[in-house]
Amino acid sequence: PPTQNSSPPQTTGAAVPFPAGISAQATGMPGLVALNRVRVTGFTQSDREVVARAENLDTGEHLEIACAYLVGCDGARSGIRRQIGARLHGDPIVQRVQSTVIRAPGLLPLIPGEPAWANFSLNPRRTGNMYAIDGRETWLIHNYLTPTETDFDDVDRDTCIRLILGVGPAFEYETIGTEDWIGRRLVADRFRDRRVFLCGDAAHIWVPMAGYGMNAGIADATNLSWQLAGVLEGWASPSILDAYEAERQPITDQVSRFAMDHAIALAAQRGAVPDSIEAPGPAGDAVRAQVGHAAYELNVNQYCCGGLNFGPFYDTSPIITHDGQTAPGYTMSDFTPSTVPGCRVPHLWLRDGRSLYDALGPGFTLLRRDRSVEVDGLVTAAAHRGVPLAVLDLDADDAETLYPHNLLLARPDQHVAWRGDQVPADPLALIDLIRGAASPFDALQPGFTE
């Protein structure tokens, strides 16, 4: 269904050149050095730093890179994960897939209906998906192996591609790249070892579904980055970093189960395609309509997945003020906006046309629904601890509907840290909790002042 009216707006699909764009953006950022063709071979860490050992793959030069913290974003085969002793747990085999990128200028005119980013091919002999890479001639073909096909070498790639595309031996295409892979549901039992952290596929692996893995990796990085920034800038206690694993590990386990359950449902549908789907005439038309409708109903939730993107909440976090109210549940496609601490800050459009998310500050933001509520005590407490805090008055039509309390404290990652109708009696205690220094010992650590 259309998602342009959702709040916040959602998009589907990510192009193959996406990583190149990210790389170009990163190389232009001040203070960031990108080392391409450099492989990290190991690291050592002490109480004060991490020293990564690396090798330039072109020159053979060996490098040592000293840093305060190291974040392993090195993918499913993560060497960082192995070195910190983290183990993957879950389901090692969910689906075997034979993937091929092809160039086929003659394919698009053969596809009925309006051009689509994704086409699902279901027939009794072979099922698979076709994804448009450039919208013209480059395609990604997924061939889903049957449960009895356990050896990729025994599956003829060309024959399967032609069965999925519905073309004969005369149809011409060029193979650009191939990859045989196994969809899994695995989550690391730890995301951290002292100064070393795991993010993205290094921490969790599941069947690729509508970018869930990419979104989860971005959420990992967003969560960890603001906490690291607080420590490095001096306003957060190092104890705040304990929140990363406490918050992200349960969420990635939940999302991994959504992805696996959906993959199992898709496999069941692929294994039950009736022979009559290719029958001519009204009888065949009826079967095709029925199978097509079932495929739509199953997959629309996969691609219109607002629930997985905006529904997860942190209910076991040590740096959130839980007030006893339970966060609403979510499904793959649906969620209920909520200000329960730990939830994503409910989105709304401000009267000046801005998205609320664009108006939030780079640090914490105190959202005030009622301008008459005094907030100086909390602002002063934040300044006393050096915590970056901005105040934003909610000038929006639906603020009272979405925000039942006068005040809400939004974290840098857009999750609710606290809510109330007035500033708490001890605002300094609240500030210490959200910066990971709730205990007196943490509050008096070097770099923090009373």
Where would I find each of the regions flagged by the language model?
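Core Rossmann-like FAD-binding/catalytic domain of the broad FAD-dependent monooxygenase superfamily
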Residues: 1-286, 444-450
